């Protein structure tokens, strides 16, 4: 019987992590855990409730009293709920995207999120994507992938995503925002964006999503047979 693995996929904003992770999870019949959506959810909630994003204690208290649930719809789409309310679309707005790196830098927030994420992965058979999965959340994951792509390519992808959703955001603004998030994510003190020593690096700039997923699936299949 094939072993159920833990797969960690890390990388900067808009490198294609979530899209690839969903494909890999679907093909392997694994559970997909979008850690970025969890951080987005608490950022959205804080903005909705008017909590000061510079107040780590208030944000951590808000997270500890809030149930964040990730489910999969019958159509295979991930849904995000806060206390039973569907916030799947609401957490993808620019206001949340622009603030999530601020909320995610706090030790109290990351500690609570890490605990929840590790509980979700206890039995294996999971694909988890984020910034610090291979280095911090699942340091013993059997497969660790670090996705890269140029800022220009990532801004292009985000721009195309926004056009599909009907959002009107300038390409240059998106590129600048991605550079800012890269800086915040890689320079934060707690669990910064960093490639794990034993992670396999894949540059996705000139690859399609399916090509990236296929590369990862080959690695997973090889590991699962060992």
Swiss-Prot record:
GO BP: nucleobase-containing small molecule interconversion; pyrimidine nucleotide metabolic process
Main location as per UniProt: cytoplasm
Top-level lineage group: Bacteria
Compartments where found: Cytoplasm
Keywords on record: ATP-binding, Cytoplasm, Kinase, Nucleotide-binding, Transferase
Catalyses which reaction(s): CMP + ATP = CDP + ADP; dCMP + ATP = dCDP + ADP
The UniProt record lists the keyword Transport: no
Any GO CC annotation of this UniProt entry: cytosol
InterPro entries given in the database record: Cytidylate_kin (IPR003136), Cytidylate_kinase_dom (IPR011994), P-loop_NTPase (IPR027417)
Molecular function, one GO term: CMP kinase activity
Gene3D superfamilies in alphabetical order: P-loop containing nucleotide triphosphate hydrolases
Official protein name in the record: Cytidylate kinase
């Amino acid at each position: 019987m094939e072993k159920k693995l833990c797969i960690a996929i890390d990388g900067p904003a808009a490198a294609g992590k979530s899209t690839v992770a969903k494909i890999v999870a679907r093909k392997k019949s694994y559970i997909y855990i979008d850690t970025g959506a969890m951080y987005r959810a608490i950022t959205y909630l804080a903005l909705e409730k008017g909590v000061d994003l510079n107040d780590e204690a208030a944000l951590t208290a808000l997270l500890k009293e809030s149930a964040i649930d990730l489910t999969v719809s019958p159509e295979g789409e991930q849904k995000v709920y806060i206390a039973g309310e569907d916030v799947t679309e609401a957490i993808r707005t620019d206001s949340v995207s622009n603030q999530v790196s601020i909320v995610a830098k706090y030790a109290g927030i990351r500690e609570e999120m890490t605990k929840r994420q590790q509980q979700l992965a206890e039995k294996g058979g999971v694909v988890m994507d984020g910034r610090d999965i291979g280095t911090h959340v699942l340091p013993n994951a059997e497969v660790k992938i670090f996705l890269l792509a140029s800022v220009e390519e990532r801004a292009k992808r985000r721009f195309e995503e926004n056009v599909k959703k009907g959002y009107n955001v300038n390409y240059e603004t998106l590129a600048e925002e991605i550079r800012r998030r890269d800086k915040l994510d890689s320079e934060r003190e707690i669990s910064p964006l960093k490639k794990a020593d034993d992670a396999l690096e894949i540059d996705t700039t000139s690859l399609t999503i399916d090509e990236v997923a296929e590369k990862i699936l080959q690695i997973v299949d090889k590991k699962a047979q060992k």
